[in-house]
Each structure stands twice: as structure tokens, then as C-alpha cells.
From Swiss-Prot:
Keywords: Cobalamin biosynthesis, Methyltransferase, S-adenosyl-L-methionine, Transferase. It comes from the Archaea. InterPro entries: CbiT (IPR023475), Cbl_synth_MTase_CbiT (IPR014008), Cobalamin_biosynth_MTase (IPR050714), Methyltranfer_dom (IPR025714), SAM-dependent_MTases_sf (IPR029063). Pathway: Cofactor biosynthesis; adenosylcobalamin biosynthesis; cob(II)yrinate a,c-diamide from sirohydrochlorin (anaerobic route): step 8/10. It catalyses: Co-precorrin-6B + S-adenosyl-L-methionine = Co-precorrin-7 + S-adenosyl-L-homocysteine + CO2. This is Probable cobalt-precorrin-6B C(15)-methyltransferase (decarboxylating). Its EC number is 2.1.1.196. S-adenosyl-L-methionine binds at residues 29, 53-57, 77, 106. GO terms for biological process: anaerobic cobalamin biosynthetic process; methylation. It comes from Thermoplasma acidophilum (strain ATCC 25905 / DSM 1728 / JCM 9062 / NBRC 15155 / AMRC-C165). Belongs to the methyltransferase superfamily. Archaeal-type CbiT family.
């Protein structure tokens, strides 16, 4: 549990969920999923990263703190409320002013900027169209990581990566249970399983 006034000053990844401001109806990539997704994203200082469907901004914040002052992260969300929440969390938790938050539908987003890595935490309703957009954002060997809750989304993401010639394609299913204090001890409360799909763009 976060103590009032406590800041996250550690170098390890995975800021506890309670450090982030939340808003009802806006999803957040939970701590354990973030840790594995960040590992799969393979980012380093100086990289340019896109966070599609940034939601509460938990991944945007973590990415910002890894890539440092010479890197840049763009958080993209169709919801103005989500973009505002991401901005608030970035202001509170980012160590660098290397983030940019954009309100846009990913399918309409138009930019000439190339990214070294793309994380997809939302906006997965139209997977084929999504990968068409990603193809315009990346260069050879850019890293792409997709989080999915639905099996169908995971399957289609794998199909798109393999069809488009991605290398090192991998899928991991993560199932996490967290302890909840009860009158008699602790009970393990399960969260929804999440699929993490990753690969290198051709």
C-alpha cells in the first residue's frame, strides 16, 4: 500500500498500481503484466517508442523512465479522458519531459515519425488495420508488443506478425493472483489472464 507522499525512487521496473491515478472505465496495464511487457519490448535509453491505447498511462510512464532524456514516447488514445489521465500520471511519475500525449484514433493517426518500438495495450478491435498502421510507424527490426485479453485477438495478432514476416514471434499467457487479507489470513484473488505477443518488424 502506498504511504501518503511516498514516491517511487527505485530503479526496478513495475511501479505499484496504487501509485497511479485511476478513473472508472479507463483500463490500466497492471504491474505484473507491465514488467513482462517491458522486458519483451526490449527498450533502452534514447529510443523512440509508441504506446497505442495508452489508457491510464502506466506503460507510458514506465517507458519514459527507461528511455531517458534522449528518448521519446508518444502515448496515443482515442479518448480525451484517457489522454488527460495519462498526462496527469506522466506529470506525477515521469522523471523526464520526454513524453507526448495525442488524442487520436490509431486508424486515423498520421505521422512521419518512425518508432524503434511499439506497444499496443488497446485499440485492438481491427487487428489487420492496426498492423497496417503499425507498418507505417516502424523500421526494420522495430520491436512490437501486443497485449490481448481475448483469445481471438491474440490469434489474429500472431497471424498478422507471421504473415508480414516478423521474426522472433512469441506468445506468452500470464495468469496472476494477488493476496488479499482476510479475517483468517490471505486469499489469492485471480486476475484475468493476459496474452503478450511480441516480434521484430521485417
Amino acid at each position: 500500500m502506498r504511504m501518503e507522499g511516498e514516491n517511487w525512487v527505485y530503479e526496478v521496473r513495475g511501479i505499484p498500481d496504487e501509485f497511479f491515478q485511476r478513473s472508472e472505465g479507463i483500463p490500466m496495464t497492471k504491474r505484473e503484466i507491465r514488467i513482462i511487457s517491458l522486458s519483451d519490448l526490449r527498450i533502452r535509453p534514447g529510443m523512440r517508442v509508441m504506446d497505442i491505447g495508452c489508457g491510464s498511462g502506466s506503460m507510458t510512464v514506465e517507458i519514459s523512465n527507461i528511455i531517458g532524456e534522449n528518448g521519446s514516447v508518444t502515448g496515443l488514445d482515442v479518448s480525451g479522458e484517457a489522454a488527460d489521465l495519462t498526462m496527469r500520471n506522466c506529470r506525477n511519475l515521469c522523471r523526464f519531459s520526454n513524453y507526448r500525449i495525442v488524442i487520436s484514433d490509431v486508424y486515423k493517426y498520421d505521422s512521419d515519425e518512425e518508432f524503434d518500438a511499439v506497444f499496443v495495450g488497446g485499440g485492438t478491435a481491427r487487428i489487420h488495420d492496426l498492423f497496417e498502421r503499425i507498418e507505417r510507424m516502424v523500421h526494420h527490426a522495430s520491436r512490437v508488443v501486443v497485449n490481448a485479453i481475448q483469445i481471438h485477438t491474440a490469434y489474429l495478432s500472431l497471424e498478422e506478425m507471421n504473415t508480414r514476416g516478423y521474426s522472433g514471434v512469441n506468445i506468452t499467457q500470464v495468469m496472476v493472483s494477488n493476496g488479499m487479507r482476510t479475517s483468517e489470513g490471505y486469499a489469492m484473488i485471480a486476475r484475468n489472464p493476459v496474452f503478450i505477443i511480441s516480434g521484430d518488424a521485417p
